[in-house]
A protein has these predicted regions:
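Bacterial N-terminal signal peptides
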Residues: 11-21
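Alpha/beta-hydrolase superfamily serine-hydrolase fold, recognizing
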Residues: 29-41, 45-81, 107-365
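A domain-start/cap signature at the N-terminus of enzymes
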Residues: 81-116
Length: 365
């Protein structure tokens, strides 16, 4: 298989949180000397109500497994695990059917990328080769639990091609090298720099997945509170909108989520990002924000196999109950940030069509 395709599958599958430390195991590998600890209470179930493509990927996931994680403020410890790519994810990439779906999508939207700097923050600019300048832009805020990941957006060309937008992917400083306040300010700086370059706020959209979803929403709240222009639209994929273990599905989906486990994977990452006393600050956990003062139209997408489902619902309710415009778009049987996990499946295509329609409706108004 083309090495470029393998790389794209791995980065697409990793961009949310799988980059280092949420490792799906095949049934044969589970319990046979795999590194790290596993969620032994995981109850595998592949519903027949999802697409065959999604069923294929879900069968390859048998529960969260994590590397032994550093203590929250161990900077060198976190650095050491960031370049780890799970061998199990490489195996998924080698699957001929999955690789063909990814290859077909990549070939449909070849793209270019270049590194840059906006507002003193590293960024990567990504655009489909068919992109034409329409003075609109999509700012992408990556996931990875705030402690992993980077601005190399595995789905960037596809998203650019589908939406017709140039993408600016933010290379914010990872925790614990920086804490939430500095990281949030970096996202604000990028958005403000685009305004200074002549982009009206109404022509700027923001996409954030997982931790990046929480960060994107928190940054927009901070922009509003500082009196800066707020973006025209916001899209959140499985947002980590409450980094404390608060919410129904942290408990009720604990055994059903094939990727995430709070105690095993998320707690130390949350503490690396924000001290416990700050974790319900609205800029850290935006479900606690005051949305009555204004907020962009927001599309929230998630799945029913994700412990962040309550984060999706609570974020939606916070915006909607304050009179804001919000759309909650939930997909049957889908795991955390499924757009990068079941890439090429009908569910991902449907979610992208919904996002495309949403941005066309609200961006530039």
């Amino acid at each position: 298989m083309d090495r470029r395709i393998t790389t794209r599958i791995v980065t697409a599958g990793c961009f949310a949180l799988l980059t280092c430390w949420a490792v799906p195991l095949t049934a044969q590998q589970q319990g046979k000397g795999a590194a790290g600890s596993t969620n032994s209470s995981y109850e595998a179930y592949v519903p027949d109500t999802v697409s065959p493509e999604a069923q294929q990927v879900l069968r390859m996931m048998t529960g969260p497994q994590g590397l032994p994680l550093p203590e929250p403020n161990d900077i060198e410890g976190w650095k050491k695990i960031r370049n780890y790519v799970p061998p199990q994810l490489k195996e998924i990439a080698k699957n001929s059917e999955i690789s063909k779906r990814t290859s077909d999508a990549i070939k449909r939207y070849p793209s270019t990328s270049k590194e840059g700097n906006l507002g003193g923050v590293p960024v990567v600019e990504i655009a489909s080769e068919k992109w034409q300048d329409n003075r609109k832009v999509l700012v992408y805020v990556h996931g990875g639990g705030y402690v992993t990941g980077g601005p190399d957006f595995g789905l960037g060309g596809w998203v650019s091609g589908e939406t017709g937008l140039r993408i600016i992917s933010v290379g914010y400083t990872l925790a614990p090298e920086a804490k939430w306040d500095r990281i949030t300010d970096q996202v604000v700086s990028v958005l403000h720099a685009l305004e200074e370059e002549g982009y009206p706020p109404k022509n700027i959209a923001v996409l954030g997945d997982s931790a990046g979803g929480g960060l994107a929403a928190g940054a927009v709240l901070k922009m509003r509170d500082k009196g800066l222009g707020i973006p025209g639209a916001l899209v959140l994929w499985s947002p980590w909108s409450d980094i404390t273990e608060t919410g129904d599905t942290y408990v009720t989906l604990k055994r059903a989520d094939p990727l995430l486990n709070y105690k095993l994977l998320l707690k130390k990452a949350a503490d690396a990002y924000a001290d416990p006393k700050d974790q319900k600050n609205p800029y850290v956990s935006p479900v606690y924000g005051d949305y009555s003062k204004g907020f962009p139209p927001t599309l929230i997408q998630g799945g029913t196999k994700d412990i962040f489902l309550s984060n999706c619902v609570r974020e939606y309710r916070a915006i909607d109950s304050a009179g804001g415009t919000a759309v909650l778009d939930i997909y049957e049987g889908m795991p955390h940030v499924f757009q990068g996990i079941v890439f090429g499946a009908p569910e991902t295509q449907q979610s992208m069509a919904k996002m495309k329609q949403f941005l066309a409706t609200y961006l530039g108004r």
